[in-house]
Amino acid sequence: MSTVRRIKKVWKSKPTIEGAGVHLKRAFGYDQVPQLDPFLLLDDFRSDNPDHYLKGFPWHPHRGIETITYVLTGVVEHGDSMGNRGLISSGDVQWMTAGSGIIHQEMPKGDKKRVMSGFQLWANLPASHKMMAPRYRDVKNQQIPEVSLKGGIKAKIICGKLNGVVGPVQDIVTDPEYLDVTVPGGTTFTHPVRREQNVLAYVIEGEGYFDQGRDSYGHEVIGANYFDLKRSCICKDQTVVLYGDGDEVSVTCEREGVRFLLISGRPIAEPVAWYGPIVMNTQEELRLAFEEYQNGTFIKHGKA
């Protein structure tokens, strides 16, 4: 008999500024790493003000991780030290494995209405893969299957499997699943997940009950004391839902529907040494990576 996962913890994304001045909401980062292993960071960038995104993320290094960029609206111009140039457009995904090291830039441009929106997820690599050759999975919107389920539920499968349909991103070491799910009001979405994996949901818009219980959970909300706690059993937009143990998730909507990312992966369970865009296992490995970046020996594969 399957066990539906209960909510372990919920929290709201928090505003921050990254890159050369990009305003975004950080769903999770450094402080949550032990709970969300193998995932390190999730940024939500949504704005209709070009001043908040046009300066972008100029040239910077990565080593030891994968960055997964999912654009909802607008365009991101991408270039890297391997000589690649391209666009990540609305509905596209770029799954970049930095491995031993890559230097790249990401410059958001927005759409005709100056709207820019999307997400970037960072996933850790195990020690055995941190120095692998960098690689890309550039996936266009039309290559991402969308499955229609009972009640008008729709799910885009970026990575993983739903109803026998497999997403285009495969052969990832932590065996992740990455779905974009839309659940209309008055319906319930259930989905099997692997018991050994960590599972989270991130609410893009709308609201819903993210397990079968209706217990109230503490939410951090911006208030007079910045992190006041508010009790609620409904998870709304820009909320992270961290699940406990089990082999199935269930999301129910009443009057209003909900759209969310459902992300899961196998924990690596290794030490994490992290500073800025580089994530290794030890402080010595981290020191060496930045030393190599400064002296021009950072790139191990491809063009420098």
State what each model feature region is.
Residues 1-304:
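Jelly-roll (double-stranded beta-helix
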